[in-house]
């Protein structure tokens, strides 16, 4: 036991690119006395329980940045007048058309919308698995949910944070020169988003976790569960003409994902470095197909009660994603 004040001190406050409301600091532990918590040599295992929760939370941080950037840039694009539409004036009562009528502004906005709304479903689904793990009385159901959650965690963390960097930059671009000026707030979103692909495990670490541990190390248990669910959905909707434009491509993508996994595994058996070389691209592919599945489910869930405008918006965004 320490007899006086333990020798722990704050050395300095870090001057960071973003998240400046978080007082990140240098801590000095020279001469401090530490206390063992739990069993010796088991600290890393204990830490990962916390880390996996934190990784999903950082994915949600990225998702929140996407949503706020989208809402701001959408409102700006509706108000900002510049040029006329290439197909003719859309607001002849105004000196120019709002920039939202221009095709590439729509692309920037739709990219944000697609990630924000598809990403929310991905996050809900991941947390559903966490609830099943914590609360289900069925051991087999808990095991399946745990494998799914482990598989999805690096996708949630890496995909939604990389998307946050892309989407906050898109939002700033919609603002043009105003986006580069601090008073409009957009540059802060760009700065704050940058850390999300770094802390709680970089995108590269998430990719190695997905491909190296969850796919190669665990015989792709989580992927097999997920692809089984995708296959069941495609089979159930195979006769639904309204979903044909999504179901056929989704089924093809699921087959390609399975084939890609086999090919990477075979290459890794000959050269282990292939895992590191392929990991990030494999994660991106996995993320895009995962969100394609959830967008198909969003369209399948639409009904008359949602209203015509809402349904049209969801359908247009799903088509953009595909």
Annotate each language-model stretch with its function.
Residues 1-256:
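Internal glycine-rich alpha/beta core junctions
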Residues 217, 233-322:
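C-terminal amphipathic alpha-helical interaction region
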């Amino acid at each position: 036991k320490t007899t006086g004040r333990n020798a722990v001190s704050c050395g300095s406050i870090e001057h960071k690119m973003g998240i400046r409301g978080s007082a990140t600091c240098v801590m000095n532990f020279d001469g401090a006395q530490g206390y063992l918590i739990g069993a010796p040599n088991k600290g890393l295992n204990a830490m990962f329980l916390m880390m996996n929760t934190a990784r999903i939370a950082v994915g949600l941080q990225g998702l929140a940045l996407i949503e706020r950037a989208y809402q701001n840039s959408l409102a700006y694009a509706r108000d900002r007048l510049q040029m006329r539409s290439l197909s003719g004036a859309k607001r002849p009562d105004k000196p120019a058309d709002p920039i939202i009528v221009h095709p590439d502004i729509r692309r920037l906005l739709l990219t944000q919308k697609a990630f924000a709304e598809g990403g929310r479903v991905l996050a809900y689904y991941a947390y559903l698995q966490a609830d099943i793990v914590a609360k289900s009385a069925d051991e087999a159901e808990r095991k399946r949910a745990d494998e799914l959650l482990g598989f999805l965690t690096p996708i949630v963390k890496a995909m939604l944070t990389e998307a946050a960097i892309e989407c906050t930059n898109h939002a700033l671009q919609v603002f043009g020169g105003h986006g580069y000026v601090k008073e409009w707030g957009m540059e802060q979103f760009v700065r704050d988003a940058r850390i999300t692909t770094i802390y709680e495990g970089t995108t590269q670490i998430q990719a190695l976790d997905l491909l190296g541990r969850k796919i190669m190390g665990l015989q792709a248990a989580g992927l097999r569960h997920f692809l089984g669910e995708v296959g069941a959905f495609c089979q159930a909707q195979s006769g639904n003409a309204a979903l044909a434009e999504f179901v056929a491509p989704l089924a093809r993508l699921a087959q390609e994902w399975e084939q890609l996994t086999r090919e990477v595994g075979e290459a890794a058996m000959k050269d282990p470095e292939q895992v590191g070389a392929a990991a990030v691209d494999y994660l991106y592919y996995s993320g895009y197909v995962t969100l394609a599945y959830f967008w198909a489910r969003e369209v399948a869930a639409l009904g008359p009660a949602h209203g015509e405008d809402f349904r049209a918006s969801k359908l247009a965004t799903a088509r953009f994603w595909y």
